[in-house]
Amino acid sequence: MEFSDVSTPRMPEAAEEKLRVLSMIAGRFESAGIRWALGASAMLYFRGLSDSFHDLDLMVAMEDAPAARDILRPLGTLLPDNRTAQYRTKYFYEFTIDGVDVDLIGGFAIVKDGVVHDCSFRPDSVDGSVCVCGRVVPLQSLAVWRGYYERMGRTARVRQIDSASR
């Protein structure tokens, strides 16, 4: 696995806060033995494929989702359930932690053409990591997220990943 320190003094203040929150969560998840990885736009950011990210998408093993939720609950505000019909995710929790939007996702499932695709987190979907403020943050693979984005109809993200793979 690769490690790189992504915290730089030139990052905007809002990005620094996201990194601080991510580092804090990573430490707590590590201490509790939560199986997880960072996905979506933040994962693309750490791989150098995006200049920014809006929130933190934490993909967790389905069995660990309730414990992960309990770890995050005292750190911030749990928002009301806001699921859409495109997803049939078993555990989906949105938090605001120190002003940072954090999505906790366990048993991820995407509905496409009436078919539910099980996209649950698996530890073998992790193919790298980064060091954020002294904490190791596992990253889900680009290949896994390319498949997710394709099922979601996010063609711009698919092209972005494809162009990086060339």
PLM features: residue spans?
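Catalytic cores of NTP-dependent nucleotidyl/adenyl transfer enzymes across multiple folds
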Residues: 112-166
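Residue-level marker for the onset of beta-strands and adjacent loop->beta junctions
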Residues: 25, 32, 89-91, 126
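Conserved catalytic core of two-metal-ion nucleotidyltransferases
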Residues: 78-112
